[in-house]
Design a protein with these regions (language model features):
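ABC-family P-loop ATPase nucleotide-binding domains
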Residues: 108-164
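Helix-to-loop junction immediately C-terminal to a conserved catalytic motif
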Residues: 72
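Catalytic Walker B motif of ABC-type/P-loop ATPase nucleotide-binding domains
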Residues: 186-190
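The feature captures the beta-strand-to-loop junction immediately N-terminal to the Walker
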Residues: 57-59
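ABC ATPase nucleotide-binding domains
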Residues: 269-301
Length: 301
């Protein structure tokens, strides 16, 4: 069982479908997630095609990390279906293709042996493991890992130990690891967490190149900060809480002052999604949203 009550499933089923279905990297259909009796997420629908660059955006505590667990094969829904790279969550061995999914997340960072060399942590993406164990890697593998470390400004970390890294250093190691195996689906959960201004801008510059690349790789960047969205990402799924009659329907499953379940309230392009009115409603605060020089920002009014 993973943190937050998510149980990792080991099985997937292969999907047979139309050419349109074969172009889909990720699809969530009426997904609901419950922890004990409480409904955390409900009516979550999302379709990400190959080659698309998405931002999953929303406040803290809305359920973004729970969705990341499902999208990365490390958790499954209470109801609904999750299809990943042509496989349905819940039915086929995930370890045969988990290395096709690149993941960077704080929870994954805690899974490595404390004394692991960051360079070794990066190459383990090729075997979808969190430690070298008995696996062997080639000189070419290490050369690629070192190239990624240079791109994100952390080449000086080679030879150090994971448990001695700062939060920002560990975050950049995990981004490098997520890119190491040239994944078909790349999931970056809060990729600038713990970075200072310089480190953040280095990371965003590198991630902008990921957003601009022309390939079949689908990318999902998860964040709650507008200013940390790199250029090149042109789709957004905005999360909020269900309201009105829908919220009333879940009242029995909301204990005390617990909030209403989270869901996706908007999918589409960033320009139509990131409006002052919409984000004010999502965050419960009057906000002014701006966009200049390819970067988004928001402030209270």
């Amino acid at each position: 069982m993973l943190a937050g009550g998510i149980i990792a499933s080991k099985w997937f089923v292969k999907m047979e479908g139309t050419m349109n279905e074969q172009s889909i990297a990720l699809k969530l259909d009426d997904v609901e997630f419950r922890r004990r009796r409480r409904v955390i997420l409900t009516k979550v629908n999302l379709e990400v095609k190959k080659g698309e660059k998405w931002v999953l955006f929303g406040p803290n505590g809305i359920g973004k990390s729970t969705l990341v667990q499902m999208m990365s094969t490390r958790g499954f829904p209470s109801e609904g279906t999750v299809d990943i790279l042509g496989n349905r969550l819940g039915k086929v061995n995930v370890f045969s293709y988990r290395n096709r999914i690149g993941l960077s997340s704080a929870e994954l960072g805690r899974a490595f042996p404390p004394q692991e060399d960051p360079l070794d942590a990066i190459v383990t993406a090729l075997t979808a493991t969190t430690g070298r164990w008995r696996d062997t890697y080639t000189d070419e593998d290490y050369a690629k890992a070192r190239s990624l470390m240079r791109e994100f400004g952390i080449e000086y970390l080679e030879g150090k130990m994971m448990f001695k890294l700062s939060e920002g250093e560990r975050t950049r190691v995990l981004i490098c690891r997520a890119l190491m195996a040239d994944p078909d689906l790349l999931i970056l959960d809060e990729p600038t967490t713990g970075l200072d201004l310089g480190g953040r801008e280095i990371a965003l510059r590198a991630l902008s190149r990921v957003g601009a690349e022309q390939s079949d790789r689908a990318v999902i960047l998860v964040t709650h900060r507008l200013e940390e969205i790199p250029q090149g990402f042109d789709h957004v799924a905005i999360m909020g809480r269900i309201t009105g009659n829908e919220a009333d329907a879940y009242a029995d499953n909301v204990a005390g002052n617990d909030p209403a379940p989270g869901t996706i309230v908007y999918t589409g392009d960033l320009g139509h999604g990131f409006t002052s009115e919409r984000l004010s409603q999502v965050f419960g605060l009057d906000l002014k949203v701006t966009h200049a020089n390819g970067r988004w920002n928001a402030y209270a009014v």
